Design a protein with these regions (language model features):
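Cleavable N-terminal export/targeting peptides
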Residues: 1-84
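Short loop/turn motifs that connect adjacent beta-strands in outer-membrane beta-barrel proteins
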Residues: 85-94, 121-129, 154-160, 210-225, ...
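Gram-negative/organellar outer-membrane beta-barrel architecture
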Residues: 88-98, 102-254, 258, 427-429, ...
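Hydrophobic, lipid-facing positions within transmembrane beta-strands of outer-membrane proteins
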Residues: 96-98, 110-114, 143-147, 198-202, ...
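Transmembrane beta-barrel domains of outer membrane proteins
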Residues: 117-119, 150-152, 203-209, 265-269, ...
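Sequence/structural signature of outer-membrane beta-barrel proteins
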Residues: 119-121, 136-142, 154, 168-172, ...
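Outer-membrane beta-barrel transmembrane domain signature
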Residues: 229, 236-260, 316-318, 363, ...
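C-terminal outer-membrane beta-barrel translocator/porin domains of Gram-negative envelope proteins
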Residues: 262-384
Length: 449
């Protein structure tokens, strides 16, 4: 959960649905001093069935033992404490978490939120079902709701269904212009960049594994998935006055717009864990498009590329080097709503810039992190860690070959904290990023990538 321009948009239209990277976010704007407190309380109830040896052997056939030996490191002293011994295997368990959150800032006002999540492991890898529900509201008019479902073996045991539903009402949404490459002084007149908006989003992704296909390279095919996706978004600004930038520029979509995208793609995932990867790599490539005649009032084509690499090494403590390289391209033009452009800034890319800072036809971006756990209490299933990160990115309105990429390079850097409570797969994260225009603070659940 976060507060930098309260965003319940866990997935924007032109962003990937990521396995267990689901973040519930908003943020505490970079334009004002930090005047917020964040209160978290987690109530977790876990019922664990300890496996006898025959059951353990059966479970190993359908799960990745490395995932469990790395991530299920609990010490069990009673049924009321969480977990199993380090050499035990979680065969059937359910983790339920409840997080109330309270924050105050001059931008958002007094905001309250609630995250409820349920993670059922079952006898399959990585889990049987992952459900999360988020609600958020503030005294200045923010209201939002988010439902997320990740369901492996939804229709058969080689598929996976991901559903994401978002509805929100903002009184202080952000618009900084389309393809704005000049530095913005946010402190002078921050209200100029704000506007009121209402948004509904529906994201569906259906994945099919190729691990049943006969092929010489069995390792590759066991980690290869193809997928189909559908996305719908409706967004409309409302009741804004002529002093706000969005009403002065009146970009396409300022009076409301909607789009429906169909997509297809493939991904390879060799990570040892989807929640806190230590080794392996991940690559997802996707093409999606909308047609004006099919539930859309504009036509658009998008290409999304996301590749990640993880390597653990030891320097006094075990440290994970994590690297993500992303590229997004669209044929966006004057008929494309401003909110459907690929976007740099905010929590995903260039932490330290505000959300929606750069609305551009195409961009590349990198995230580089060093992650480590600094303290662990096996009695309470508690781990505390930290991160150091550097982000970079660039954008252009030209072609890949002729675009002026070097003139638009941006950098941010920062650090963060990690807390794992009760379950090693439930991680709270806070990032503090710095840019030439200010800073950004992001509270979220799960690793960024």
């Amino acid at each position: 959960m976060a507060f930098q321009r309260p965003y319940l948009d866990a997935y924007c239209t032109n962003k990937h649905l990521s396995l267990n990277q689901h973040s519930f976010k908003a943020s505490l704007g970079m334009r004002v001093p930090l005047l917020a407190f964040f209160l978290l309380y987690l109530c977790s109830c876990i019922s664990v069935v300890f496996a006898a040896l025959p059951i353990t052997m059966k479970a190993v056939q359908v799960t990745d033992p490395v995932h469990f030996t790395n991530d299920a490191e609990f010490k069990s002293s009673s049924l009321h404490l969480i977990g199993t011994h380090k050499d035990s295997l979680l065969v059937d368990s359910t983790v339920t978490g409840l997080i109330p959150a309270l924050s105050y800032s001059t931008d958002v006002g007094l905001a309250g939120g609630l995250i409820w999540s349920k993670l059922s492991y079952g006898q399959q890898d990585p889990f049987r079902q992952n459900i999360a529900v988020t609600a958020l509201a503030s005294t200045k008019g923010l209201a939002g709701f988010n439902f997320f479902l990740d369901q492996p073996c939804s229709f058969n045991c080689v598929d996976r269904l991901i559903v994401n539903l978002v509805g929100n009402r903002f009184l202080e949404d952000q618009y900084y212009g389309v393809f704005t490459d000049q530095r913005i002084e946010l402190k002078k007149n921050p209200k100029r960049f704000e506007y009121q908006s209402f948004t509904i989003k529906v994201n569906l992704e259906y994945r099919i594994s190729t691990n049943n296909l006969a092929h010489k390279n069995e390792t590759l095919f066991n980690n290869l998935n193809g997928f189909l996706s559908t996305d719908f978004q409706y967004k409309t600004p409302w009741n804004n006055d002529d002093t706000q930038l969005i009403m002065l520029e009146k970009p396409t979509g300022y009076a409301g717009a909607y789009g429906f995208w169909l997509g297809l793609g493939g991904l390879i995932d060799t990570r040892d864990s989807e929640f806190y990867p230590r080794q392996g790599w991940y690559s997802k490539q996707q093409v999606k498009g909308s047609l004006k005649s099919v539930l859309s009032n504009f036509t658009q084509t998008l290409f999304l590329s996301d590749t990640r690499y993880y390597q653990e090494f030891k320097l006094i403590l075990p440290i994970v080097f994590a690297q993500r390289i992303s590229y997004q391209w669209s044929n966006s033009n004057a008929n494309t709503p401003y909110w459907s452009y690929p976007t740099l800034g905010g929590e995903e890319f260039l932490r330290g810039y505000v959300d929606n800072r750069f609305l551009v036809p195409q961009f590349w971006a990198t995230n580089t992190e060093l992650r480590t756990w600094l303290y662990e209490s096996t009695n309470y299933g508690l781990k505390i860690g930290g991160t150091l990160f550097m982000d970079s990115g660039s954008f252009t309105d030209g072609t890949i070959a002729s675009g002026d990429w070097s003139a638009n390079v941006r950098y941010t850097a920062g650090f963060g904290g990690l807390v794992s409570l009760f379950s090693p797969d439930f991680i709270l994260r806070v990032d503090l990023g710095f840019s030439e225009e200010g800073y950004g603070i992001f509270f979220s659940t799960g690793m960024l990538f």
